[in-house]
């Protein structure tokens, strides 16, 4: 935010360097980050244990926040690839289907001893995920001038304000279980504008925007 508001290229250059190191050397396939419990932070490059993975729920949420801001500053869809991966995997794993038990850390493998808890002595993750989930609609679209960026594919009916129009968009889809997405677009007034559809990286066998993983 500071880099965007002040137009300070030094800030943004530093952010891009840190991001490239994270996306290329320190990102779990789930979109989780932070391999070490000590200091709740990153370890050396490629330190991505399964059983010992820390991947705090709060860190996955922060990864969404960070990549959303990077997208808003650049318009580059690669950042939304990480938003989507972290949201569907690293974040949502942090809460049970019943909504009353939580993971603080999210290892990728367990001998059965790692279970969600009702609360923690340091209960940052339950509150953070409870705050985050109602905000998910804010990540579906973005605008620039007359144009609309469709970043996430979800079953949703939205009214989007651009610089000169209000556009209703209805997405009909079972994504992520099925890839088909139907769009109904209804602008308040006739004018030319673009809807920029994100092509997810995983469609091109690039699940994250680096050479870390391929399938």
Residue ranges of model-derived segments:
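Glycan-recognition and catalytic cores of secretory/periplasmic carbohydrate-active enzymes
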Residues: 1-215
């Amino acid at each position: 935010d500071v880099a965007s508001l002040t137009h300070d290229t030094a800030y943004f250059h530093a952010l891009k360097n840190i991001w490239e190191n994270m996306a290329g050397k320190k990102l779990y396939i789930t979109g989780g980050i932070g391999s070490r419990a000590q200091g709740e932070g990153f370890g050396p490059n490629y330190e991505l244990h399964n059983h010992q993975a820390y991947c705090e729920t709060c860190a996955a949420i922060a990864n969404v926040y960070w990549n959303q801001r990077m997208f808003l500053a650049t318009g580059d869809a690669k950042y939304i690839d990480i938003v989507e991966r972290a949201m569907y995997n690293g974040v949502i794993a942090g809460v049970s289907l019943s909504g009353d038990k939580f993971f603080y850390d999210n290892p990728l493998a367990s001998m059965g001893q790692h279970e969600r808890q009702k609360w923690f002595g340091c209960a940052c993750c339950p509150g953070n995920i409870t705050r985050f989930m109602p905000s998910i609609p804010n990540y579906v679209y973005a605008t620039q001038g007359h144009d609309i960026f469709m970043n996430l594919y979800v079953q949703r009916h939205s009214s989007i304000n651009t610089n000169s129009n209000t556009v209703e968009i209805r997405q009909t889809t079972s994504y992520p279980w099925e890839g088909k997405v139907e769009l109904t677009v209804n602008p308040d007034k006739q004018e030319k504008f673009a809807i920029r559809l994100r092509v997810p990286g995983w469609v091109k066998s690039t699940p994250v925007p680096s050479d870390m993983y391929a399938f």
